[in-house]
Amino acid sequence: MFYHSTRNADAAVDSSRAVLEGLAPDGGLYMPEYIPGFDWQACLSGSSQDMATMILSALLPDIPDMRALVARAYTGKFQTEELTPTVTVGGFTVLELFRGPTSAFKDVALSMLPQLLTTAKAVNGMEKDIMILTATSGDTGKAALEGFHDVDGVRICVFYPHGGVSQVQRAQMVTQEGGNVTVCAVRGNFDDAQTGVKQIFAACQGKDLPFMLSSANSINIGRLAPQVMYYFRAYRDLLDAGKISLGDEVNFSVPTGNFGDILAGYLAKKLGLPVGKLICASNANNVLTDFICTGTYDKRRPLLKTTSPSMDILVSSNLERLLYLLSGDTQLVASLMKQLNTEGVYTVPAELLAAIRAEFWGSYCDDKRAEETMGRVYKNLGYLCDPHTAAGWAAAEDYIVETDDHRPMVVLSTASPYKFPVAVLTAIGGDTSGSEFDQMKRLSAMTGVPIPKNLSGLQGKEDRHTGVIDKDAMLEYVLSL
C-alpha cells in the first residue's frame, strides 16, 4: 500500500518506508492513498493482540510477520491481557489506557513502534542507525524511552519543555537507563520543542548523516496506527457486557492535545467500527474547541500551563491528517499549513467545516472544572481519575446536555492519577504537602488505589539526563550526539 504526504500526492512510498521516515520530505504527514476494506466484525471476535494484528496488517501491509511483532510488543508488559480494560463508572464506560509500563495511553503505541520501525529498517535494507527524535509534553517521552531503550540499531533523543512537565513525568525521563538514550530539557514550551524537532527534520533533509532521522511522535503513522485497536476493544467490551447490540453506534470522548488519539478513533470508524460522535476534549488551551466551533484555527494566543500538561498544546499536528482525510485535497492542506506557519491562523472552507462537525464535537475544561470533576467523580462514584480524564468526562457531560444524544458513551482515561498527585489530592480534599512521591503515598493511603510499580520505584533513582538548552540549539545538540 502506498502512502503519500498530506501536502503532495505525487511522491509515494510504501507503508514500511512511511514508518521509517516518520515525516514526509515536504513537512507533511504520511497517509495511505485509500483506507483499505476491512472485516470489522471479524476483528471484534479476537483478543486485543488479534485485533492489533488485523488492524496493523491492514494499515501497514508492507511490514511482515505482524502477529509475531504484536506478541513481542505486548506480551507480559501490560497489567491485563486486554491491554486496555474498561470499567463502568456511573453512566459512562471508562477505557483505561494507563495499564502499560509507563502508566500512560502512549504505551499502547510506543510498545509497538520499535517493532514496526526495526522491521521496516530490515525490509528497506537500511544499515545506518535510526535516530528517533521526539518532543514530549510529558507522557510520550517516557513511553518512547521505555520502548526504544537498548534496541539494536536505534538511538533516541527526547526533548521536553523545561519546567513544563510534572515532577513524576520528569523523574520518569531523566532516570531512564539505556546505552542508546538521551533526554534534554528545552527552555520554552511544548510547541517550541515540537517545532524544533520539525525544523531539525527539515534542516537535515537530503544531507548525508551518520544516522537516519525518524520520529516517535504521532506524526509517525507507525505511532498512530496501533492506537486504533483500543476503540475496537472498547466496543467489544460493551458488546460482551450487553450494553449494545452489534452495529449500535458508540460515542467516544477523548482528551486531546496533538489530535492523534482522537484521529485513531476516526480511523477506526473508517475501518467500519460503528463510532458515533468523537468528542474532542481540550483544557484551557482550547484552540481545537474554537476550531470545531468556528472553522478558524488560531494559535495566536498564550500557551497556558495547566494541571493537564499533555494537552498544553497550541499546534495540534494530527489535525492536518483529518483535513486531508475529509477534503482529499493536498493543495488545500499545504496552503492551510503554510498559513499556519507564516500567519498563525487559517480558516477552512464552509463545506470542510461541515464535514468536520458531522464527525466531531468540541468542548474544553479549565483547571477549576477539572478539579471539580475529579472530586465529584470520586465522591459520588468512587472512581479516581487524573486531570486529562476529567476533561474527557466533563466534555462528555457537556455533549449530552447540549445535544440530548444518549448513545453509549466511552470516556478515554489517558493517564494514571498517580502521575498528577497534587491535582488529584487537591480535588478530593487531601494534603498536598511534600514531594510528589509523598503525595502519591498519601493518595494511595486515602483511596486504597495502589500506586503503579513503575512510578513508586522512581523515588531515589539517579538523575542521568540533566541537560537544559535553548530551543535554537536543538539542531546542534542532535548533530553532536
Question: What name fits each language-model region?
Answer:
Residues 1-481:
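PLP-dependent amino-acid enzyme catalytic core
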